[in-house]
């Protein structure tokens, strides 16, 4: 991964690098690899993540089509 340092502005380059790493999922990958995960646990985690993703997508789709409110309550006097 490469980030250009312009005008000796290291702070800006560091922020750009952290943003790139966050977007690529490197921090999450490092956290996951910091300990051993049994293959069965990995499959279970990935399955749970997939279920969570599909539910979230279905919820967003239903909200967009107007079947479900967006979860906010409106106070009526």
From Swiss-Prot:
Is Transmembrane among this UniProt entry's keywords?
no
Q: Name one GO biological process term.
A: translation
Q: The organism sits in which domain of life?
A: Bacteria
The organism's lineage? Answer: Bacteria, Pseudomonadati, Pseudomonadota, Alphaproteobacteria, Hyphomicrobiales
Provide the family line: Belongs to the bacterial ribosomal protein bS21 family.
Signal peptide bounds: none
| This protein's record includes keyword Endoplasmic reticulum | no
Q: Which UniProt keywords apply?
A: Ribonucleoprotein, Ribosomal protein
Molecular-function GO terms, alphabetical: structural constituent of ribosome
- An example Gene Ontology cellular component term from the record? ribosome
Q: Report the protein name in the record.
A: Small ribosomal subunit protein bS21
């Amino acid at each position: 991964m490469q980030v250009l340092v312009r005008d000796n502005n290291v702070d800006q380059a560091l922020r750009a690098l952290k943003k790139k790493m966050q977007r690529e999922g490197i921090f999450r990958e490092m956290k996951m690899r910091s300990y051993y995960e049994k293959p069965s646990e990995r499959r279970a985690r990935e399955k749970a993540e997939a279920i969570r993703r599909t539910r979230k997508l279905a919820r967003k789709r239903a909200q967009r089509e107007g079947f479900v409110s967006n979860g906010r309550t409106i106070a009526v006097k």
